[in-house]
């Protein structure tokens, strides 16, 4: 137990100092901040023109779909790097576990492709 405390003490000190610095900076900003909002500063548009349309315009769902697919495959790469580094010392369970993971992602990618989620036309 004492060995673990010696190993992780620098990390705990770093996290404590980072948290303390963040709290000090937030409190300093709250104390020093100027609070005199006038109607011009809190208006939606500071350019002087009134809004022509509603600010909430429709956004194509395909952009969200592409971003979700990017996150999924980015996580796949994040899991593949440690697996590739320790490939020589993997057990059979770890190897086949990641093969199942890759198979599920491949099936999901094939499904998205077949449904036309990656088509923009």
From Swiss-Prot:
The chain crosses the membrane at residues 11-31, 65-85, 93-113. It is found in: Cell inner membrane. The keyword Metal-binding does not apply. One of its GO terms (molecular function) is NADH dehydrogenase (ubiquinone) activity. It catalyses: a quinone + NADH + 5 H(+)(in) = a quinol + NAD(+) + 4 H(+)(out). It is a multi-pass membrane protein. GO terms for cellular component: NADH dehydrogenase complex; plasma membrane. It comes from the Bacteria. Keywords: Cell inner membrane, Cell membrane, Membrane, NAD, Quinone, Translocase, Transmembrane, Transmembrane helix, Transport, Ubiquinone. The keyword Signal does not apply. Belongs to the complex I subunit 3 family. NDH-1 is composed of at least 14 different subunits, Nqo1 to Nqo14. The complex has a L-shaped structure, with the hydrophobic arm (subunits Nqo7, Nqo8, Nqo10 to Nqo14) embedded in the inner membrane and the hydrophilic peripheral arm (subunits Nqo1 to Nqo6, Nqo9) protruding into the bacterial cytoplasm. The hydrophilic domain contains all the redox centers. NDH-1 shuttles electrons from NADH, via FMN and iron-sulfur (Fe-S) centers, to quinones in the respiratory chain. The immediate electron acceptor for the enzyme in this species is believed to be ubiquinone. Couples the redox reaction to proton translocation (for every two electrons transferred, four hydrogen ions are translocated across the cytoplasmic membrane), and thus conserves the redox energy in a proton gradient. This is NADH-quinone oxidoreductase subunit 7. The gene is nqo7.
